């Protein structure tokens, strides 16, 4: 496993991301594009935010991550879930460049949510995703188009929270901690290494063997993030 800045993120990730409207809008797209799909691989699942939402909706989910702090949160969620959900949810240690052996192929979808920006060899991850999808299976990838404008994202998020009456002491405390870590993440050239415009990612996926574009935009995180969904 890799113990890095994401171990520090583990405490605040759920507290903040689950409250960010920009994250919720992106997660809603993932739920939209996996509607009715039976088996979803959540590669680089982090704390299991997306995995848990998929499992609750009835999907069978295999999630994996290589950071001990994030993985511990996902494992705790899985263990505390009601038995029917727990039975459909597998959480593993693993690297997105070479999926764990226990990850079954023939999946209906592979989700790469805020994953590729941390990988120097994105082609390896995309090939692994392709190899684990059934014909017609979907790859969903979301992430930054460039080094993110943290100030813009947080200022607009805080304005939304205030307008909704959610900007309370607990959220302010979690935000302060999260922003400090995120600032380290976005300014360290070794932490964020790969960025995509949606059109560029679509072209790369076509080159690797994906065929049909179901979604491709750059609306998320107030224009900072791309979202792409393509069929094998």
Regions found by a protein language model. Give the residues of each.
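Short alpha-helix
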Residues: 192-208
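Conserved class I S-adenosyl-L-methionine
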Residues: 1-35, 49, 53, 80, 140-170, ...
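Class I SAM-dependent methyltransferase SAM/SAH-binding core
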Residues: 41, 47-98
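A conserved beta-strand element that flanks and buttresses the S-adenosyl-L-methionine
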Residues: 111
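Core SAM-dependent methyltransferase catalytic element
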Residues: 208-209, 217-232
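A short glycine-rich, Lys/Arg-flanked "PGG" loop and its adjoining helix->strand segment in the class I
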Residues: 123-135
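Short conserved loop adjoining the S-adenosyl-L-methionine
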Residues: 98-104
């Amino acid at each position: 496993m890799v113990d890095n800045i994401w171990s520090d993120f583990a405490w605040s990730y759920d507290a903040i991301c689950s409250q960010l409207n920009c994250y919720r809008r992106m997660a809603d797209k993932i739920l939209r594009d996996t509607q009715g799909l039976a088996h979803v691989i959540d590669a680089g699942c982090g704390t299991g935010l997306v995995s848990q939402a998929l499992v609750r909706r009835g999907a069978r989910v295999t999630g994996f991550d290589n950071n001990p702090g994030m993985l511990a949160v996902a494992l705790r969620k899985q263990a505390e879930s009601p038995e029917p959900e727990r039975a459909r949810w597998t959480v593993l240690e693993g690297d997105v460049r070479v999926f764990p052996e226990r990850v079954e192929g023939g999946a209906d979808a592979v989700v790469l949510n805020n994953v590729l920006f941390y990988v120097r060899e994105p082609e390896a991850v995309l090939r692994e995703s392709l190899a684990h999808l059934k014909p017609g299976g979907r790859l969903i990838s979301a992430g930054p188009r460039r080094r993110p404008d943290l100030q813009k994202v947080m200022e607009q998020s805080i304005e939304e929270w205030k307008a909704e009456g959610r900007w309370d002491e607990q959220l302010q405390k979690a935000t302060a901690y999260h922003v400090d870590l995120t600032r380290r993440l976005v300014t360290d050239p070794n932490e964020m290494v790969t960025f995509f415009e949606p059109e560029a990612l679509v072209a790369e996926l076509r080159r690797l063997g994906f065929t049909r574009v179901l979604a491709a935009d750059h609306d998320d995180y107030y224009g900072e993030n791309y979202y792409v969904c393509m069929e094998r």
